[in-house]
């Protein structure tokens, strides 16, 4: 068995052995575990933590602490700091979504991004909400600054168009940064997202924004499994239905979600340039072991992955696996959403029609639009922490 299952022993290991290495301040009263790991969900996907480090650290000394953290595990094969996310490139900040604003960002996009933007402008010219949403999908990674370890150590980053920004200047103009780690736990790496709050700030609005974003994405992408998440939120005060939805999402289909996250982890580490062959192998082996437990999966893709394992070498393996995992992701996503349709239909029909818009859920819209768009942006890979 390669799947990572929650146990109290594992929880103690993470709290006692991992968090002291990766948190800015590891004192127990200085961090809160959020999300599914806090709820002790069986299938572990990733771990979200808020680390409150003020007043011990603020914008005058947090930079050196991040540098010390990076240096402390430079030779630690278990821990990879993929990105430090802090600051924005306000050239990509749209307020009115006017033609003038959009033309200004077009000159900063690469050819692929430009094609995507033009497609959105054409497809959603009569739907402002969706146009705004999908434009932000395209430019989000350009707007939010993602710093590699080497850029943090250098103290600077070169943006599109050759503009240089200072890490310390960015830190002074913000209140929170995100440390995006991957840590090998047992068989393969899982993600740790550490939100480091180094100035007094209320995060309620940030969490509300993130939750509302996820609600819209679940609806816009027409994916029944991910649309169960806002249903669970809606029924949070009904213990019976909430428990039923929790079981469906996290236990019945928990391995589907975990495998989707594993594939996304592979792709994220690969795209960051941090994926070595041993890490790639560990993820691939774990996927091959566990994928056979799922229903509705095209095993031809698995056969191709195994063929690459047997016949390709070195970097060629990593590249070929990345391509095949993209196909497998779509296949798993399609399967779990098809199986979830009956549950979505059952619970959406309990909600009064006047409340469905509050949940960004309208069954009629989903069905009339032609069903699920499996090629669309999906709920998991675009999970955002909006700070």
From Swiss-Prot:
**Coiled coil among keywords:** no
Protein keywords: Virion
Q: Which GO terms describe its cellular component?
A: virion component
Q: Which domain of life is it from?
A: Viruses
Query: What is the protein's species of origin?
Result: Acanthamoeba polyphaga mimivirus (APMV)
- Name the UniProt record assigns to this protein: Uncharacterized protein L544
Q: Does the keyword Transmembrane apply?
A: no
Location comes to: Virion
